[in-house]
């Protein structure tokens, strides 16, 4: 089913293609909250929205919020979405962490089915707004 506004989210820890090592939701969250966006490398909607996503990340930072991208696609189905290709994309100047949900457990828990999908989580870990299934 996934998270709806008012739901408390569960944490996660995933490998970060933009800076190495694992990163958790707690690492991203601030006392104000965070934006979590499910995205990938191959999706034309994501590719066409990269500038807007980067602007959203900059605005989140300006407001004191965390921002993180999560790729949950199966690299066996979409080779462009492999961790190595995520690293290559991040190296081109991605201004936020880009995490790999290889098992798709996080996407399943959050209810993310398409890309991009955005969740605004407040400082208490409660979904304030979700922009999902827009395509």
Please tell me what each predicted stretch does.
Residues 40-51, 118:
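Short, thiol/selenol-centered motifs that function as redox-active sites or metal-ligating centers
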Residues 87-115, 119-121:
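Short, internal strand/loop/helix patches
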Residues 9-10, 34, 115-117:
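Short loop/turn microsegments at loop-to-beta-strand junctions
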Residues 48-91, 106:
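Structural microenvironment flanking redox-active thiols in thiol-disulfide oxidoreductases
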Residues 1-26:
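N-terminal "domain-start" segment that seeds a small globular fold
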